[in-house]
Amino acid sequence: MDFLANLCCVNKLTLLEEFILSKEGTSFVLPFPEEWRVTFHSLETIPEISKEDIEEIRNTYLCCEKTLIVVGVLHHVKKSTCRGPILLQGDRGHLYVYNGFFDKSLYYVSSNLQDFFLVGLKFFYPIYELCDFIVDFETGSKIVEHSKSFSDMIIYRDENINVCFILKSSPYKTYTRFCRLPMTPYTDQDLHRWKRVIRCNIVDVLFCVKHNVFGKWFELVIIFDVNGKIFGVDDEQIIFLAHNITEFLKIGCLRFNENRRLHGYWFERTNDVRNVEEELSRQINCPWGNTCKRKKRNIFKQPLLWKSVGRKNNSAHNVL
């Protein structure tokens, strides 16, 4: 613990590099997910990445950081300690994970090392693929079993209308129930609008999820398309949540409030998006916040908190 305390107090990148070099190969348990570690490495001891690669990552995914240094490698306890996603730190202490093994993106995972050792890889979305369900295993397995096709999922939904289960997500548990469109505040007109936005002709409601914040209940409608992608709907926009139902049952609604996935040159593009996931995710916020050097009014918006999905004049849908 003394070692971690000393590490978290190192502010200058040059001193941090020296500190990591002196502790090369030291591994620490991450709070999330289970059985994952970070092993401290200098750049020279990681075979799949070079100084030029780090510079390319910085130029491609970050708008403000002048420097990135390697902190270490993230890996399962039973895997090699020098192969896996790379943990990087920027000028102001922000921590990033380069995801060359999954989707070649950079993820902003924490504001500093101290925070990183509290939350682990919570905001490294691809890691959830390797995690357990955040629902009862039997419930999750049955839902996944019936998700092999859109029609099978609809049949299973209709057989389980109003059946509830709990997503054991952090920091709030979310209470989830199967429902149809008429059971929500939305109409067929809304459904047609969702199809246009998602660019898919086959879309339907799957769940309603509710959670309690400081004594107030909030509800979010969950929809899915024929390709299996999962979205959350509020009055303002549709937000991408998961690539499929299996991922949703592991990650929950984490993506609804903010977006930590930094895709290539996100800070230079406003309308030129490459896919539905990027277009319908929350807008990315520069980790530097209000001091961002390239801050533009239409790019860096504050993340919207999970609000109720009921119409403004129909609050009965929002409170239990």
UniProtKB/Swiss-Prot annotation:
Domain of life: Viruses
Protein family membership: Belongs to the herpesviridae US22 family.
Pfam families for the chain: US22 (PF02393)
Native organism: Human herpesvirus 7 (strain JI) (HHV-7)
Database matches in InterPro entries: US22-like
Protein name: Protein U25
Gene field: U25
